[in-house]
Each structure stands twice: as structure tokens, then as C-alpha cells.
Swiss-Prot record:
Coiled coil: none annotated. This is FMN-dependent NADH:quinone oxidoreductase. The keyword Translocase does not apply. Keywords: Flavoprotein, FMN, NAD, Oxidoreductase. Binds 1 FMN per subunit. FMN binds at S17, N18, S19, M99, W100, N101, L102, S143, R144, G145, G146. Homodimer.
Length: 208
């Protein structure tokens, strides 16, 4: 039995969002095809994720020195630890995001910061940093109104590229994507683009 974290980062549901529609199709098909697996949904817009700020950095320093943390420091550090441990407990991750300003919503970066922890998801060695998530799988589903996979705008895409880079850094050996793009550039193709993405999601769900 595998544990899957279904991590969504969109303020709207599948009736409005193409990425959420594809994500819903994927996870429903996945659950039908893998009924023995556990699926946990994390809505990043409804989840408290402390940003790494003065309290967090000071709290981590105090923990290393065996010092007492303030209430705010303890609350934030404990919450980040809970997020990390939940992440580590899973075998597979499905991240659903829109493209915002060439990247993704800021809640995604906050989540990545929470789980990118030395000694937990990567380590430093004489050969340099080494990822520790060597038995995990990641799927990223992202919608983009324009075309960024190929063409003149390809170099501007920094959302999926960043996620692929950080997951590789953390040692993840399997990273797949479902990209939904062009529905704003060519509105007359919106339904076709959406239907294709849902079909792709359902197909991948059987083997992921």
C-alpha cells in the first residue's frame, strides 16, 4: 500500500480551474485503480504554512543550542516540523498548480521551503548536496493560459522548471508532468484542451 499526498494550490475548484479539473480526474481514477492506497488531500490555500522568518530561524538556532523557544517560535517551528513529517510519510506526490506570473502561487514556495530541510530531505556530503527522497514519485499538473512548453516564451517558464529542479535536488528519481496550456491564447480550443488534459490525467493515473 502506498500513501499519496494530493497537494492542490488553486483558490478555485475544478469547475473554474483547468488544472484542478485535470487533478480531480487524475485522483479519482487513481483511487479507482489503486483502492488499497491511501490518499490525503492538502489544500495549500487552506493550510497554515509558516514562512521562514526571524522566529523560525531564531527558533531553529535555539533548538540546536538546547535553548528555550518563545511561544511564537515554538508554534511556527512545530508546525513546520509537522508539515515535513507528513511529507516524508508519503510515497507519491501529486501537485496541482496554475501558472501565476511565470511560476506558481506563493503558497507552493512556502510549502517547498517547509519540506526542503537538510538532514531530512537532503544532506551535505564531501561530494556536495545529496537528495534523500530516492524512493519517491512526483506528478505536477499545471495549467497555463499561453504556450510555454515550446516557442519564444519557453525560457520564461519557471514554475514546472523549479519544481523539477528542486525535486531532483531532493533525490526524487521519477518526476512527471501534465501541462495544460493555450486556452487563453486560443479560446476557441478551450474545451478541446481541457478534454485532452483530463484524458491524459486519467491514463497516467492507471500507471502512476
Amino acid at each position: 500500500m502506498a500513501k499519496v499526498l494530493y497537494i492542490t494550490a488553486h483558490p478555485f475548484n475544478e469547475l473554474v480551474s483547468n488544472s484542478m479539473a485535470a487533478g480531480k480526474a487524475f485522483i479519482e481514477t487513481y483511487q479507482q485503480q489503486h483502492p488499497e492506497d491511501e490518499v490525503k488531500h492538502i489544500d495549500l490555500f487552506e493550510t497554515y504554512i509558516p514562512v521562514i522568518d526571524k522566529d523560525v530561524l531564531t527558533g531553529w538556532g535555539k533548538m540546536s543550542n538546547g535553548e528555550t523557544l518563545t511561544d511564537d517560535e515554538q508554534m511556527k517551528v512545530s508546525r513546520l516540523s509537522d508539515i515535513l513529517e507528513e511529507f516524508l510519510s508519503a510515497d507519491k506526490y501529486v501537485l496541482v498548480t496554475p501558472m501565476w506570473n511565470l511560476s506558481f502561487p506563493p503558497v507552493v514556495k512556502a510549502y517547498i521551503d517547509a519540506i526542503s530541510i537538510a538532514g531530512k530531505t537532503f544532506k551535505y556530503s564531501a561530494e556536495g548536496p545529496q537528495g534523500l527522497l530516492t524512493d519517491k514519485k512526483v506528478l505536477h499538473i499545471q495549467s497555463r493560459g499561453g504556450y510555454y512548453t515550446e516557442g519564444p516564451a519557453a525560457d520564461f517558464e519557471m514554475g514546472d522548471r523549479y519544481l523539477r529542479t528542486i525535486m531532483t535536488f531532493l533525490g526524487v528519481p521519477s518526476y512527471e508532468t501534465i501541462i495544460i496550456e493555450g486556452h487563453n491564447a486560443e479560446p476557441h480550443k478551450t474545451e478541446e484542451i481541457k478534454a485532452t488534459s483530463i484524458n491524459n490525467a486519467e491514463k497516467l493515473a492507471t500507471t502512476f
